[in-house]
Regions:
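Structural preference for beta-strand elements that scaffold enzyme active sites
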Residues: 41-43, 72, 125-127, 194-197, ...
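Carbohydrate-interacting/catalytic domains
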Residues: 13-74, 80, 113, 118-119, ...
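Bacterial N-terminal signal peptides
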Residues: 2-11
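Short, solvent-exposed turn/loop segments enriched in Gly/Ser/Thr/Pro and often Arg
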Residues: 74-88, 129-138, 199-205, 228-233, ...
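Active-site-proximal helices and loops of the catalytic beta/alpha 8
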Residues: 19-25, 29, 189, 199-281, ...
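Conserved, mostly hydrophobic/aromatic
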Residues: 44, 65, 75, 99, ...
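Substrate-binding/active-site clefts of carbohydrate-active enzymes
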Residues: 20-41, 46-71, 77-191, 211-220
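Active-site groove signature of glycoside hydrolases
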Residues: 165, 179-206, 283-287
Length: 463
């Protein structure tokens, strides 16, 4: 929600600056390494990840995360939180007091370095949140007022009125740019990080990001930079990956019944028509800015939404606790408080950990789901059901997802013989039970198909 408000607030400025419009669809996106294309990103809010809310608790949980199948750990801001004008009891982690320091509530620099080192030993990448657009009002940078945007009275101002707890940085200042680039370089050099997730990246000039990326690449070129925005210019030189906010908004509206499922296809086609060739977008149904999908749409609705996230093109995101079926309040005002994930709920919702692990495993074992071309397929009820294929080489995967609370029986536009590969997330069967094997071998019966309410099914073409 906040993203669209921000976009509206700066739309006049953007339109004025982009005349004539640059056609990014004719350009090529920055080339990303294979590990970025194949990534499954896992977002961690350190404060609420555990009762202790520290780095060591995350380190102790790395084996579980590795077994889950995620590949990139995104740590929300690790820096001290500002107290002046702070929101809520503890304050927003996005109100940073010192970019070079560690939040003492989370632990020490040594604790963070150990978390990163232990992650690397398990083949996991680690990125941290960088809030480059603004700082807390008690930031150590306040001693240099020229670093900040000021009104005609010389008063430092927030980026937008609702963000009263932060002060806007002024990227017209060359000294500020140098300070920020040196800070980014130090995090890569001193902590051996694997990249950054950059908060409200579109509020910071693109040419700054391009210069910063060029200089950081000299230290460690094989990194991932994730932009929290949705703008094609960011993906040409600076970033590997951008948010897919428009897809998320469409998905939420479809699930609540205010838009037809075909809106997701329309958004996808619009994105592909304006983004550079080879652009990567991050898909998500949940994150720290949003109310939990399970709280909004129930268990089955949340799983259907995430099934789409795992099977669309792009890179999927998991926000900590989703894999347990956690319903703890998320987004503001929870962002400013201590509200730990209720991990024990997984015992009562065992289908959630099974779903996440099995869907990640399916994706890892399918080149088509990771990198295949996407083609939309017609079906007999496109107001409620999405059907599409993912194809690479000789592998052809068909996905059908019912985004409504009513069962579906109809047909999908396809031909040939398929086997069903939908993960089984019910109670585990005995080791010698051959039912799953039989299910895999049988012809799936397409083009006729049935889907439960909020049901999803995945098929692979038999060659």
């Amino acid at each position: 929600v906040w993203f669209w408000l921000l976009l509206a607030s700066c739309s006049v400025f953007v339109n004025a600056q982009q005349t004539p419009a640059r056609d990014f669809s004719k350009e090529t996106a920055r080339v990303s390494p294979d590990w970025v294309k194949d990534a499954v990103i896992y977002e961690i809010f350190e404060r609420n990840y555990s009762q202790k809310g520290d780095f060591n608790s995350i380190t102790a949980d790395l084996d579980r995360l590795k077994n889950l199948g995620v590949t990139v750990l995104w740590l929300m801001p690790v820096h001290p939180v500002g107290r002046i004008k702070a929101k809520g009891t503890i304050g927003s982690p996005y109100a940073v007091r010192d970019y070079y320091a560690i939040n003492p509530d989370y632990g020490t620099a040594a604790d963070l370095k150990r978390l990163i080192s232990e992650s690397h030993k398990r083949g996991l990448k680690v990125i941290i949140d960088i809030v480059a657009n603004h700082t807390a009002w008690d930031s150590v940078m306040m001693k240099t007022r020229a670093f900040y945007t000021q009104n005609t009275q010389g008063e430092i101002i927030p980026p937008v009125p609702d963000w009263a707890d932060v002060a806007d940085l002024n990227y017209d200042n060359a000294e500020l740019r140098r300070y920020m680039i040196e800070m980014l370089k130090s995090w890569i050099r001193d902590y051996d990080l694997d990249g950054f997730r950059c908060d409200v990246a579109g509020f910071v000039p693109t040419d700054f990001w391009e210069q910063a990326r060029m200089e950081v690449d000299k230290i460690k070129p094989d990194t991932i930079w994730l932009a929290e925005w949705e703008s094609p210019d960011l993906l040409v030189k600076a970033f590997n990956l951008d948010y897919s906010w428009e897809n998320h908004s469409a998905l939420m509206n479809v699930l609540q019944g205010s838009l037809p499922a075909s809106e997701i296809r329309r958004v996808w086609e619009s994105q592909h028509a304006k983004f550079p060739r080879g652009a990567l977008l991050m898909r998500f149904s949940d994150n720290h800015d949003e109310r939990r999908a399970i709280a909004r749409f129930g268990e089955r609705g949340a799983l259907a939404a995430q099934a789409l996230v795992f099977t669309l093109d792009g890179v999927p995101l998991i926000y900590n606790g989703m894999e347990a079926g956690d319903t703890t309040e998320s987004g503001a005002p929870a962002l400013f408080e201590k509200l730990p994930v209720f991990w024990q709920i997984a015992d009562r919702r065992p289908e959630f950990p099974r779903f996440y692990k099995s869907m990640i495993d399916l994706r890892k074992n399918s080149a088509a789901l990771r990198r295949g071309d996407l083609r939309w397929l017609k079906n007999s009820d496109e107001a409620r059901v999405l059907t599409f294929s993912r194809t690479i080489g000789t592998e052809d995967v068909l996905v059908a997802i019912n985004l409504s609370n009513q069962p579906f029986f109809g047909a999908v536009e396809t031909s040939g013989v398929f086997e069903e590969i939908t993960p089984e997330i019910g109670a585990p069967l005995p080791p010698d039970d051959d039912k799953p094997k039989a299910k895999l071998k049988n012809n799936a019966g397409l083009p006729a198909i049935s889907l439960d309410a909020f049901g999803y099914r995945i098929f692979r073409r038999k060659n």
